[in-house]
Amino acid sequence: MDNNKIIVFDTTLRDGEQSPGASMNTEEKIQIALQLERLGVDVMEAGFAAASPGDFDAINQIAKQIHSIRIASLARALEKDIKAAGEAISPAKNRRIHTFIATSPIHMEHKLKMTPDEVIKRAVEAVKYAKTFVDDVEFSCEDAGRSDIVFLKEICAAVVEAGARTLNLPDTVGFRMPDEIYNMVKSMVDFIGDRAIISVHNHNDLGLAVANTLASIKAGARQVECTINGLGERAGNAALEEIVMTIRTRSDEFAPLYTDIVTKEIYATSRLVASITGIEPQPNKAIVGKNAFAHESGIHQDGMLKCAQTYEIIKAEDIGAEKNSLVLGKHSGRHAFKDKLINLGFDLDDNEINEAFIKFKELCDKKKEIFDDDIRALVSHEIIKIPEIYSIQTLSTSSCNAGHSSAAVSIKFSDNIISDAALGNGTADAIFKVIDRISGISGELKDYKVNAVSQGKDALAKITVKVVFEGSSCATIGHGLDIDTMMASAKAYVSALNSYLSMKNR
């Protein structure tokens, strides 16, 4: 192994999906997986196979389609979890089972209700069983940040002897400071030596996930677990883009360490994840926030015009975030459109290009100026293959007195056009009520987000909804894209309905 290489373990599809409102369907996960492959991550944790049939299917489909990187599934230290993980990743060329058990006193006593000796025995059994499915087993000490270092060494030595190749030390609740993480990792690196790779997985509850990860690297960790845009439950995980660009930018601190990440794919990956999950990075987010390369201060602008390096330590083009210039128009041909897609990082087959080109031409008839971000949103939206059980045909709305609104909707279903109308508390509510009536399936709206894809009065509206439909305990996410915000809302709600029905019918 090259001891200067930092292995990038991306868990956007597993831990990142645990962000409230970030659940994804199988097709969406596949699109992100394909982009992560282009980004050049070393290991992709595709999900938690035992969590649900949907998770198992997504991991299995990704394992069939991704060839150049290692595919992992998480599994508790239980035979049924490990068996599910092994079966889900079986089509992959390079496979890993990532099994874990809690090691902190509070978790062992209150959650597991097990003694330390029992935990070690369970961990060893789990690793040995995982080895019957794959050669590459990773073991995680859940809540390592609050675990006793003597016990950590004892359990890690035992699982390494059982066959674990990677030892992961998560700061599960984001409690530790960089110096504390450094000391823990350094102690473990010195103890384990070259018997296994030491990995870290830091949460961001105190805003220290990236700082703790960088401290871990300096202490000798050679695998970092992270997510795109820092997605994750609670305050999120360490952001992949921040870790990678820090190592690259501060070579004075980290050389000769390096990653194999293709940094020019960072922006495209960030935008795809934001588009699919509906969770936009905050504007001032490092590296990928929309203000990351914006300068409003007159002094800063003057310096930038004279020499960009006066106020920018990273170039926008380094992460593939070139200026959002006008690109194509209504007279642009298919060949020019295909070239633009390649430049934006999309790898589509001929049928997908044709479908996207038709939608692009429709957009050109509605929108005067087309920007890169319009095309990114349009194509990302079109390549997510959700069966179109229902489709919006027409929509008209009007505002009434006392805050009420009405909506009339026509929907295509099984070659039939069904029309209806309803009143609601606001236009969106009226639209959703009509769709419920036409489909005969009522939904409860849990979240509704509006984003302008690009600049201008005629900017595309990207709507993301989160809906719980009757008979389901889980929320379904839908996306809609249109110049008209209410039409985008209708499309998003129908997208969620179609996604719910397609999953229900599997």
Swiss-Prot record:
Catalytic activity as recorded in UniProt: 3-methyl-2-oxobutanoate + acetyl-CoA + H2O = (2S)-2-isopropylmalate + CoA + H(+)
Alphabetized UniProt keyword annotations: Amino-acid biosynthesis, Branched-chain amino acid biosynthesis, Cytoplasm, Leucine biosynthesis, Manganese, Metal-binding, Transferase
Residues annotated as binding Mn(2+): D15, H201, H203, N237
GO biological process, one term: L-leucine biosynthetic process
Cofactor: Mn(2+)
Enzyme's top EC category: transferase
Domain annotation Pyruvate carboxyltransferase: ranges: 6-267
One of the record's GO cellular component terms: cytoplasm
Pathway: Amino-acid biosynthesis; L-leucine biosynthesis; L-leucine from 3-methyl-2-oxobutanoate: step 1/4
Molecular function in Gene Ontology: 2-isopropylmalate synthase activity; acetyl-CoA C-acetyltransferase activity; manganese ion binding
InterPro entries hit by this protein: 2-IPM_HCS-like, 2-isopropylmalate_synth_dimer, AIPM/Hcit_synth_CS, Aldolase_TIM, LeuA/HCS_post-cat, LeuA_allosteric_dom_sf, LeuA_bact_synth, PYR_CT
Region ranges (Regulatory domain): 391-506
Entry keyword annotation includes Amino-acid biosynthesis: yes
Major subcellular site: cytoplasm
EC number: 2.3.3.13
CDD domains xref list: DRE_TIM_IPMS
Intrachain S-S bonds: none
Domain of life per record: Bacteria
Complex and partners: Homodimer.
Family to which this protein belongs: Belongs to the alpha-IPM synthase/homocitrate synthase family. LeuA type 1 subfamily.
General function of this protein: Catalyzes the condensation of the acetyl group of acetyl-CoA with 3-methyl-2-oxobutanoate (2-ketoisovalerate) to form 3-carboxy-3-hydroxy-4-methylpentanoate (2-isopropylmalate).
HAMAP family: LeuA_type1
Name of the protein: 2-isopropylmalate synthase
Encoding gene, per UniProt annotation: leuA
